[in-house]
Structures are given as C-alpha cells and as structure tokens.
UniProtKB/Swiss-Prot annotation:
Disulfide bonds: none annotated. It catalyses: RNA(n) + a ribonucleoside 5'-triphosphate = RNA(n+1) + diphosphate. GO terms for molecular function: DNA binding; DNA-directed RNA polymerase activity; zinc ion binding. GO terms for biological process: DNA-templated transcription. Coiled coil: none annotated. Its cofactor is Zn(2+). The keyword Nucleotidyltransferase applies. PANTHER family: DNA-DIRECTED RNA POLYMERASE SUBUNIT BETA. Its main location: plastid. This is DNA-directed RNA polymerase subunit beta''. The gene is rpoC2. Binds 1 Zn(2+) ion per subunit. Keywords: Chloroplast, DNA-directed RNA polymerase, Metal-binding, Nucleotidyltransferase, Plastid, Transcription, Transferase, Zinc. It comes from Oenothera glazioviana (Large-flowered evening primrose).
C-alpha cells in the first residue's frame, strides 16, 4: 500500500466513520475481492480483542457534569426575571412561553456539548463514553439524559411542557418530574407502535413512484446542472454532495483547465477543489436529465456499491425508494431513543468583538423599532446594516444581515462578547412552522378596559371579537360582580355602602294576601369571626339562626387619652368620638393592654342600649377552678342577673333585674376530669400533699382532701384545701352542703378570725363507716366598686350628662351563684366583666326609630396616624319599613337586607338565593349591554392598599419605631371615601376628613388648630374617549375600599409634589406596576387612578395583559369578565419540535406535500415574487416561462434540503441522488392554465414538464402553465401505466377510466411486467437486447439555439440571480436556491 495512504490511518482511533473511509479507500486501490479479504481479517481481530477485553457498565460510571449546578441556577434566574416582566405587563404569555422554552433548551444543549469534553478530560476510558461515542449502542442524547438533564418534554399532543425536568436519570426524578417524564415516554411508546406500519407504507409508496426509472442511456446531452459552492455549506456536506457526481461544465483555474465536462468526481478531485477554493461548481443531476421516463448514466453518476459509473439497465429508481424508506423503519424502531424530549432551534447571535462605542446609520428607512420574539425592545433592520465599533485603537466593522434585530442603541457603549444583534431563525423557509392559537384566560373577575383603539374583524362584525392594530395593554379592573334577576328596582344605589359578609339575595315575590309575617321563617348564615351560634326567639319576630360577628378594636392606653382630650373637646351634638388603636400598632409601640374591647355589630348600626364595649378588669381574674358565692345562703336577698338579648346582630342590654351586691366570694378548688379507664392512685376522702401523683400522668398542684365522683363523662377528682375539724356534737352542724361565713362575723380576737380574715366556707363531709368531720375552706373576697371611673378611661367630655348620647357602665358577674367554674388548659378565668352601654334620649320630634351609627375617622399628623371611632345618631332607612322600597332612599346594605319587617305584607313567599360577599364595599353602577339582566359589580376589600412615607415620628415615653418607607398598611373596613359608614344621601357629606394645620410633638401627642373639611372628590369612571360614564341604573358595580391603593405624597416638598403629580397622574389613567409616580421610589402595584387629592392618589388595582398587533380581544369595553373567561387570543408561528418520533411524519409530509405544511404557502409567495420581478430582470419575452422554470428548480432544491435535514438530524446518511430521483417525479407535472393551449391540452390538465416544453416548441406558440406539486400518492396514480396505478390503489376506478379512455399501457416499468408475468426490462445484461437504430445514429446532434440561450441566461449571470433570489425569498445565503445542504 502506498505510504501516503498508510499515514491516513496511522495511530488513530478507528470508529465507525474511519471504518467507512478505510473501506472506500481499499475498494479504490484493490478492488472488491481484496477488500473483502482484508475486512475479514479486521473482523477476526475485532472479535478476538472484544473477547479478551470485556466492558462492564455500572451506575458509578455515570458522571454528572460539574457545571450543571450553576447552569441550571442561571436558567432559573432568567425564568424568574421573565415571570416578573410578565407580571408587570412587559411581555405577553406567548413571548414568555417561547423564551422560557428557549432558555431551558439552550441550557440543556450546552450541558450536552459539555458532556463529551468532560468525559475526555476526567475519564476517557469510561464505559458509557466508549459505548455511546463508538456508535455501538446509545448516542449523545441518551447519555445526556443519564448524566446531564432530561430537559423539556412534549406531551402526547406534541405540545411543549414549559416545566423542564432539571434532574437526570442518574440523580433520580421528583414526583412532578416523573409524571412529566411519563408524558413523553408514553408518547414514544405509542409512536413506536403506530409508526412502524407507517414506515413500511412509506417505502411502498416511494417504490411505486420511481419503479420505472432505469438507466437507459449513457448521455442525454443536457447542458444544465446545479451549482454547488464550498462557501455556502459545511465542508463535510460539500464532500458528500460532490463525490460520485459528474461535472456539467469544465473547471478552470485562471486559464488552466483542471477538470473537464462529463468527468466523474472522486476524493482527489474534491480535495483539489477545496484547496483551490474554486467557486460554483456545476454538476449534473437527475433534475436536469432530458430523458422523459428514464435516466442517463452521467446525470446519475457513480454506483453506490462500487466506485464506477452506474451501468446501463440498473434499476436506480427502486434503489432510491428503498434508500429513503428503509431508514424510516429504523427511525421508528429508535423512537424510545429520547422518549419525547424536545429539540428545537434558537436564533443566532452577533457578539461584539471588543469593548467600545457602537455606531450605525440610524435611518428610518434602514431600521425601525420592533419587538423581538421574546418581547424585548429592538431595532429591526430592513436591509444590510453596517455597524462600527470604536475601541481605543481599533475600528471593528460588522454587517448585520436584513430581518435581524439590533439589540443596542446608537452610540451605546458595549462590552466584549455582548450580544448586539439577533439573526432571526424564523425567516428561513426550511424550518417547520405551524400557526398556533394561544388563548389567555382571566385569573380574576373584573371590568375589561383597553388603552388603544380596536377594530372589528370583518368576519366578526356583529360580535364581541376585536382585533388590535398596535401593541397595547388590556386591563382587568378588579371588582366582584353579582347578577340580580329580580325586580327592576334595586336595593342598591350608586355609591351605596355594603357591609362585611353582606349577601345579595335574588328574590321573586308571588302576590298572596293570606300569609302574614308570623308564618314566614328565615335563616341567615354569615361567616363568623367568633364561631358562636345563638338561637334566640324574640317576641314579635320569627326565628333567626344567626352567627354573631364582632370586630374587636382595643382602646389606646388611658393616660394618652387624658392628655389627648383637647382633640375631642369640640364635638357636635349626637356624636361620640373614641380613639382606637389596632392590636398590631399597640404591639409595635409596646403599650400595655388596657383590656377594653369595642364590639361593633356587623352592619355598624347600634340600637338603643346596645353594648358598645366591654372591659375585663385584671383584678377579677383567677387561674384556678372554684365556686362563686354572692353571700351566705341565709344572709343575701334573692338576686337575679340581668340578661343579654341578641337582637339582629347587636348585643343589647336589658336591665330586667338590677344587681344589689357590692362584693362576692370565690372558693378555689382543684378539679381533674379523668377518663373512666384511667387508674386513680388516691382514695376518696384521703388527704394528700402538694405534687402528689393522683393518676398515671397527673400530679396535684395543691394539697388537701380528695373527693372522687363518677360521672357520665368520666371521673371527677376534686382536691379541697383547708383544715379539718372533728366536732363534738354532730347535731349542731347544718346538714346543708356548705355555709359561707363572711369576714367579720366570728369572734373578733380569736385566732381563727385572724386566720380567716377573708371569710371561710364550711363544708360537712360524711365518709362511709367513719366519723363525720367538717372542712374549713379558704375564701377569696372580691369587692365590686360602684362602677369604673369613666374619667379614668375616657376624656371628661364623654361623661357629660347634658348631651343626649350617653355611656352607661354596668358590672356583670359572668358566673351564677354557687355554680362551679372549671378552668380550661391553664387559661385565666374572668369573673366580672364591665359593659359599656350606649344610650341616648329619644328625640320627641321624630317618631321613627333612631339608631347610632359607627364609623372610623383617621387623623394624620405628620406621618403619625391616629384612628377614632365615631358614633353618630342617624335615622337608618333599614330600620324604617316605610323607606324600604323607596327608590330615592339609599343607605347601608346590612346583613339582613330582606328582614321580614321590611317586606310588605302584600308580598310574601320570598324565595332567596344567597351569594355571600367578602368584605365591606361600595356599589358602583356598570354599563351593561343587556338591559334584561342587571348586574352588580362589587369591588372587594382585599385589593386595596395604600403607600406612604411614614417617617419623622418622634414622641417621648411612647416607644414607636418609624415605620419603613413605602410600607403597605391595610385600610380599615370603614375608612376613607369608599368606607365612611354614613348613608349616602348628600354626596358632599360622603367624604369626611379631619385635617390639621400644625402639630406640636411634646411629651404627649397634641394636635392643635383642628378643623373639619369636606372634600367633594373627582370620582368617576372614564370611558376610552375620556367622557364620564352615564351609568345604567339597572346594573351595578360594588366597589370595596380594599380594592383601592392609597399613595401618599411626601410632605416635605408639599407644594412641588402637588404640581408634579398633577402633571404626571390624571384621573382614569392606568399605571403599570414598578412605574414611578413620585420621587420616593417606584409604585408597587398596577391599577387605574380613581381619586386624585392634594396629597394622595387612590388607585383601583388592575391586572394588565400585554397584547401585540393581530391579537384578538374577546369582550366589549367595560364588560364584566369572570374568572376563567377568555381575554385575548394570540396567533403565532411555532417551530414544530424536532423530536425523533416526529422525523418520519415530517418526511411523509414533505413527500405528500400536505396542505398543513408551510411548503405550499411559501411556494405560492415565491411564484408571485418571481412573476413580479422576472420581467425587470430578464426582459419580457421569456419572463413567464423562466419564472415557472425557476420556481420548479427552487421547489425541488427546497424539498431535497428538507428531507435531508430530517435524516441528517438523526445521523442517517442518504445520498442526495436518491432523494433527487423521488423529488424529480413529484415535481415533473405542470398544470395547464385556463387560457393556454386549448387546442392541444384541456384547461387545468396535468401534463409532464418536458412534454409541455416540447409541445410548445413544436407548435411554436407560448404555453401558459403553473408549477404544481403532487404528493407521492397522487404521483403514483398519475403515471403512464394504468396497470401500475390499478395495482396500487382504487383499482376499479382506475381500470374503468382506462377502459373508457382507451388507454394503452406500453409495459415500460417493472411493476406492469410483474403483474402480467412478462420479462422485467431491468438488469445490467438487458443492454444486449436494446439496439440503437441506424436512423438514430444518423441524426446530427445540433445544440438548439433555445437551449444555448437558456444556458446563457441561467448560468452566465449568477450574481444577478443570487441577489434577486436572496432578496425575494428571504433566505439566508446558505439556503440559496442552487444549494444542496441542510443548514
């Protein structure tokens, strides 16, 4: 063997590729016989070595890539940032999904590329590495899943699951990852079963198309070819394309010819081409062969089995069909290979070569603003853009190709390796794209608004589907909704209040005069804060099952109140103001708990003698069980306690019996309730000491006498402390259960009287079979004062009797006389509770029932906020039955809106359907298209927040930390413009604020110069044209104060900020989250400006949805959308996943030219483009003909590249010639136009391309035809042989049509001859039967002028074509129409 040849395989690893090269070299040098002998020796050597060296594979051989951790972390950071931008409304859902998939795909791919170098460096002889990279079993993708990450998966429908599997199979999957992994694996299993049959069927159809193609002649004489350039494809593919082909033209270097026409190309010639960098090489191809039904040797090239030109009679068609079909069978058998793992393509990036300032021509004709596929702002280049980067000493020039996105601004400083441009991969027609609809659903209910003009789609003129002309935001303004199908008059008026947990009831009234109120029963259920259920039957009212709902607010520490009394001195009649403080603020200020709790009814309405608050005095608390006694049995008068009546949710005080005692006694004892099965370790009536074990897990806390009683629920074990006396005479002891001896009744100076100075409790014990004895138990005495000093708790002004609103104090002993009290799990027991009862004098002038109304008022003093509870006497329309159905009256909506007292006796049998509402809210009217069904919108409290700088708060003796800047503080249920609990009759009085002029921070907080201000605020909803809504009275929105955000502006630059804010913020404006309103930082939530005041802005929270042009909006402006409704639909192009299980369907789609694929769309555009520009380029005469011709050439190249791309991605090598033969057949038909050659062909008749050209030349008239793509199935049914067609499909139809038309079958193909049993006209020995006639030899081979002209036009003006094609087809240069490649 030659020495040069020997060095090629010297000291190299022989893998699969090297073996192929070795065999081809051996065949070239030694021929087939010697090569087979050498290969036998190689095989024997291999088997011997494999037997001697075995390989074992263990789980420890799977080495995880070290860089995986930070790569995954980086991808998670990008995903998190993406989620934020989506929340802010900067990117929409499709862009977010697309970028998320590409981030994880890039991470997975990078890990896969890192895998091989990692193995080579750390463990080159790793069995996994050897196995997969030698080609024995497995491949990079499978090993990547074992040691890298499993990556993104497809679901059974082929859609992408955007949650990646970050683990690999070596680490193990989590539960979620396992379920997602099963999706893809299931898809792989199903595909394997289904597609195996498809592969066989594909082979059959392919063979059917090309079975008649046989090598029949040596040279067809064509002058055409396709040009291949080494610059436009990778070197490996360039070599594969050229080897075995035949040159269509001479190759010159300068004036020297190095290769001649019709010379076949070997490896040596290819190496010379590469080394000399010869530009476009024209090669012959089956596309340009002039044989109609056959193919010539030179257009086919070398035989794949041995290196010579193919012999005459070779059935190259069947070889081509099997070459493409057989790997398809292999592909389906390898579907489990990745198990549904997604593979796709990402855009190419242009990076800066060095640091410097970037400059380019910022011209609107060259670049214009756009959005990238991921929603980032960028500049779109419409043509080639020259970019210069100026560093310190070097100028770098770059050219950005057209249709690319420039990601930097002009004159911006860029760093080295920074991405400055993105070459969009989506412009190529070779990618598999599909148009997908993506629906975006609302995740909350609310009102729909949009910030741009929209227009109706033509097909949806009368519906609620709109198209967006430009990028804009859609807004869902928060608020609940409630539809009422009831009577046209509504209980709710615009700006009315709604109370917490209030229910909207849909009611139908059936007129019946017979029923009266006593026969109607109601049940009201509302959520409770305290979970107690009370059933109370009040006289004159039907039964109500209610759950008491109370709000507890604790009063501020009394000493501050006394100092603060100036604040409350000037007050109007019929009003009571009490400062309150929430428990959270009290904890922050470290103020001790005063124990006063205000108890507000749900609807904020107090009746007369309602309980306003209660006070638990810590002096009357005990931690032990015991008995309360008011006096001794013989000494105290009969006293009954007063009762509390629950009346419509208000604790009302009814003084039925007045307390007359001034003290009471508490006899402590220790009680243990034990289960019946427990073993007791002490006996009845025995004496024990402290900490004695009385049961298995129980010890006594005190010593004394033990009493054991068996009860229904278990064993009661009581321990009485005290002293035991054995009296001499039993009869003197009273037989009562016990006698209380108050202090001071015994002998003054005796030891016992000193010992029992608090009084004693005498109890007689009678044990069985033993002597009687008496137990003296200690007593705790509690003195009850004549009532708490009101001045100690409230400012003096509150205690004035002259006003008609009063506070009364009543002490209430919680437990009855002689009743045992049991402690519960170490909690203290309150024995006495002090009630504060609200009372007022009845106004004689008004006969209607008055009620007191509670509301919260807020005073802001230099950032320090104080809340006050204000109680006003009002005439409540809810308590007045006459005003119930008065449409002009508006008021509070309480829990019991449809109480029976308010139902007219003429209406009865109400049927109610309840829908509980969340929070205190305000009703708003809503514009509704449907007049029949009014709807309510309730703006609920959970969406409201306010922001403000709370700082510079300094006060002594009150430790208060400055609240952090921009803290979010929830607004109380009843504060502010939407929450004051006044009835809204006068619009002016609705907004009630207390403001201040000056604040002095001295020892205690004092507010001077108080004045009350009334503000009528701007408070309307705007429509898109800026006009104020004219609300429809039949539909309502209910706003809730918590849906609003309060934004307080800084006080230090008060005047400036007011001027600034008036220019920045306008009423009805939408503000995105993270945008800046004022100088003190970004705004925290998105929404619509609802109220603008001097020092604050109230914003109704809203959710933005970004929508791009062409998106479809569902719903009308101002319409209520519910949770889960479709907001917008995007139409976008998506790359189909390049999963191996989809390889075969792709090949089939291309070959069948299915309409779902994008080929037909692209071809249509290309034909149009060529028809527009061909006249300008080529001149008029041949324009249309050459346009159709080039369209066919372009479509053929495109098809070959698509099919090759699929197979090469799976590592399957198929020579282009095989695919070209198939593609030649499916593109060899043209469609006659309506106006063309009516005397020869019928309009819209399918004829062969060569036949059309020859007929046109023979008749010397122009032919009008269109390029037409047939799929392989239709091609099989459009052949010259009806026997072949009938044996494939639709036998009866084909034979019937052939009989009617009188078709002749010339039996030229293989299949026809097999069917009728004739000799097959194929085989290398068949050439002896084919004789050339003398007439054929005598014909001079003149080259026609037409061919010469076509050759001249097509191939001597290549530069002109290249520029035209690249501009009109929008292909990257690698994908020009004369190139065979897969890039």
């Amino acid at each position: 063997m030659d020495e040069g040849v020997n060095l090629v395989f010297h000291k190299k690893v022989i893998d699969g590729t090297a073996i192929k090269r070795l065999i081809s070299r051996l065949i070239d040098h030694f021929g087939m016989a010697h090569t087979s002998h050498i290969l036998d020796q190689v095989k024997t050597l291999g088997f011997q070595q494999a037997t001697a060296t075995s390989i074992s594979l263990g789980i420890d051989d799977l080495l995880t890539i070290p860089s995986k951790g930070w790569l995954v972390q980086d991808a998670e950071q990008q995903s998190l940032s993406l989620e934020k931008h989506h929340h802010y409304g900067n990117v929409h859902a499709v862009e977010k999904l697309r970028q998320s998939i590409e981030v994880w795909y890039a991470t997975s791919e990078y890990l896969r590329q890192e895998m091989n170098p990692n193995f080579r460096m750390t463990d080159p002889f790793n069995p996994v590495h050897i196995m997969s990279f030698s080609g024995a079993r497995g491949n990079a993708s499978q090993v990547h899943q074992l040691v890298g990450m499993r990556g993104l998966m497809s679901d059974p429908q082929g859609q992408m699951i955007d949650l990646p599997i970050q683990s690999n199979l070596r680490e193990g999957l989590s539960l979620t990852e396992y379920i997602i992994s099963c999706y893809g694996a299931r898809k792989g299993v199903v595909d394997t079963a289904v597609r195996t049959s498809d592969a066989g069927y594909l082979t059959r159809r392919l063979v059917e198309v090309v079975q008649h193609i046989v090598v029949r002649r040596t040279d067809c004489g064509t002058l055409r070819g396709i040009s291949v350039s080494p610059r436009r494809m990778p070197e490996r593919i360039f070599i594969q394309t050229l080897i075995g082909r035949v040159l269509a033209d001479d190759i010159y270097i300068g004036s020297r010819c190095i290769a001649i026409r019709n010379q076949d190309i070997g490896i040596g010639l290819v190496n010379r081409f590469i080394s000399f960098r010869i530009q476009p090489i024209s090669i012959r191809t089956p596309f340009t062969c002039r044989s109609t039904s056959w193919i010539c040797r030179l257009c086919y090239g070398r035989s794949p089995t041995h290196g010579d030109l193919v012999e005459l009679g070779e059935a190259v068609g069947i070889i081509a069909g099997q070459s493409i079909g057989e790997p398809g069978t292999q592909l389906t058998l390898r579907t489990f290979h990745t198990g549904g793992v997604f593979t796709g393509g990402t855009a190419e990036h242009v990076r800066a070569p060095s640091n410097g300032k970037i400059k380019f021509n910022f011209n609107e004709a060259l670049v214009h603003p756009a959005r990238t596929r991921h929603g980032h702002p960028a500049l779109l280049c419409s043509m080639d853009l020259d970019v210069t980067i100026e560093s310190e000493d070097i100028l770098h020039n770059l050219t950005i190709p057209p249709k690319s996105f420039l990601l930097v601004q002009n004159n911006q400083y860029v760093e080295s390796e920074q991405v400055i441009a993105e070459i969009c991969a989506g412009t190529s027609t070779f990618h598999f794209k599909e148009r997908v609809r993506k629906h975006i659903y609302s995740d909350s209910e609310g009102e729909m608004h949009w910030s741009t003009d929209v227009y109706h789609a033509p097909e949806f003129t009368y519906s609620n589907v709109h198209l967006l002309p430009k990028t804009s935001h859609l807004w869902i303004l928060s608020g609940g909704s409630c539809r009422s199908r009831g009577a046209p008059f509504s209980l709710h008026k615009d700006q009315d209040q709604m109370n917490p947990r209030s229910t909207e009831r849909e009611r139908r009234y059936l007129s019946s005069l017979s029923a009266n109120n006593d026969q109607i029963r109601y049940k009201f259920f509302s959520s409770s804060f305290s979970g107690k259920k009370k059933d109370d039957r009040s006289p004159g009212y039907s039964e109500m099952n209610r759950i008491i709902c109370t709000l507890h607010c604790n009063l501020i520490y009394p000493s501050i109140l006394r100092e603060n009394s100036d604040l409350l001195a000037k007050r109007r009649r019929n009003r009571l103001v009490i400062p309150v403080q929430s428990s959270q603020e009290r904890e922050k200020e470290l103020i001790p708990h005063s124990g006063i709790s205000i108890e507000l009814p749900i609807n904020g309405i107090f009746r007369k003698k309602s309980i306003l608050a209660f006070f638990d005095d810590p002096r009357y608390r005990t931690k032990s069980s015991g008995i309360t006694q008011y006096e001794t049995m013989g000494m105290h008068s009969i006293v009954k306690k007063e009762g509390l009546v629950d009346y419509r949710g208000i604790n009302e005080f009814k003084p039925k019996y007045q307390m007359t005692i001034d003290r009471f006694f508490f006899i402590p004892e220790e009680v243990h309730i034990l289960p019946e099965s427990s073993s007791i370790m002490v006996r009845n009536n025995s004496l024990i000491g402290v900490d004695t074990r009385i049961a298995l897990n129980t010890r006594s806390r005190a010593g004394g006498l033990v009493r054991v009683e068996r009860k229904k629920r278990g064993i009661a074990l009581q321990i009485f402390s005290g002293t035991i006396h054995f009296p001499g005479e039993t009869d003197k002891i009273s037989w009562d259960s016990g006698i209380l001896i108050p202090p001071g009744t015994g002998k003054r100076n005796s030891k016992e009287s000193k010992k029992w100075k608090n009084g004693i409790y005498v109890q007689r014990i009678t044990p069985t079979k033993k002597k009687h004895f008496v137990l003296f138990r200690p007593v705790v005495t509690y003195e009850i004062a004549d009532g708490l000093n009101l001045a100690r708790l409230f400012p003096p002004d509150l205690c004035q009797e002259k006003d008609n609103m009063q506070l009364q104090i009543v002490n209430y002993i919680v437990y009855g006389n002689g009743k045992p009290i049991r402690e519960i799990s170490d909690t203290s027991i309150q024995l006495v509770r002090t009630w504060f009862i609200l009372n007022w004098d009845q106004d004689k002038k008004s006969a209607s029932a008055e009620a007191a109304h509670a509301s919260f008022v807020e005073v802001r003093a230099k950032g320090l906020i104080r809340d006050f509870l204000r109680i006003d006497l009002v005439k409540s329309p809810i308590l007045d039955p006459r005003k119930r159905n008065d449409p002009s009256g508006s008021g509070l909506i309480s829990d019991n809106v449809s109480d029976h007292t308010n139902i007219n006796p003429f209406y009865s049998k109400p049927k109610m359907k309840q829908s509980p509402r969340q929070n205190h809210g305000t009703i708003r009217t809503l514009l509704n298209q449907n007049k029949e069904c009014p709807s309510l919108m309730i703006l609920s409290a959970s969406n409201c927040f306010r922001m403000g700088p709370f700082n510079d708060v300094k006060s002594q003796n009150v430790i208060k930390e400055s609240i952090k800047k921009d803290a979010i503080i929830q607004i109380r249920n009843s504060i502010g413009p939407l929450g004051t609990a006044l009835q809204v009759v006068n619009f002016d009085s609705f907004y009630y604020f207390i403001t201040h002029n000056q604040v002095l921070l001295t020892k205690y907080l004092q507010v001077e110069n108080l004045k009350q201000t009334f503000q009528v605020l701007q408070y309307y909803l705007m429509d898109e044209s800026g006009r104020i809504y004219n609300p429809d009275p039949r539909s309502n929105i209910v706003l809730n104060s918590f849906n609003l955000s309060w934004y307080f502006l800084p006080h230090n630059n008060y005047e400036n900020s007011c001027e600034e804010i008036s220019t920045i913020v306008s009423l009805g404006q939408f503000i995105c989250e993270n945008g800046c309103i004022a100088k003190n930082g970004p705004y925290l939530r998105s929404g619509q400006v609802l109220i603008v005041q001097l020092d604050s802005v109230v914003i109704r929270s809203a959710k933005p949805y970004l929508a791009t042009p062409g998106a479809t909006v569902h719903g009308h402006y101002g319409e209520i959308l519910y949770d889960g409704d479709t907001v917008v639909t995007f139409l976008y192009e998506k790359s189909r996943s390049g999963d191996i299980t989809q390889g075969l369907p792709k090949v089939e789609q291309v070959l069948e030219v299915r309409s779902v694929d994008s080929i037909s769309v692209n071809l249509e555009k290309r034909v149009e483009n060529w028809n527009e520009h061909i006249t300008r380029i080529l001149g008029f005469p041949w324009g249309f003909l050459i346009g159709a011709e080039l369209t066919i050439v372009q479509s053929r190249i495109s098809l070959v590249n698509k099919i090759q791309k699929v197979y090469r991605s799976q590592g399957v090598q198929i020579h282009n010639r095989h695919i070209e033969i198939i593609v030649r057949q499916i593109t060899s038909k043209v469609l006659v136009s309506e106006d063309g050659m009516s005397n020869v062909f019928l309009p819209r008749e399918l004829i062969g391309l060569l036949r059309a050209e020859r007929t046109g030349r023979a008749l010397e008239e122009s032919i009008c035809y269109k390029a037409f793509l047939l799929g392989i199935t239709r091609t099989s049914l459009n052949t010259q042989s009806f026997i072949s067609e009938a044996s494939f499909q639709e036998t009866a139809r084909v034979l019937a049509k052939a009989a009617l038309r009188g078709r002749i079958d010339w039996l030229k193909g293989l299949k026809e001859n097999v069917v009728i049993g004739g000799m097959i006209p194929v085989g290398t020995g068949f050439k002896g039967l084919v004789h050339c006639s003398k007439q054929h030899k005598s014909i001079p081979k003149n080259k026609h002028f037409f061919e010469g002209e076509i050759r001249d036009i097509l191939f001597h003006h290549r530069e002109l074509f290249d520029s035209c094609i690249s501009k009109n087809f929008h292909d990257t240069p690698e994908q020009s129409f004369r190139v065979f490649n897969d890039s």
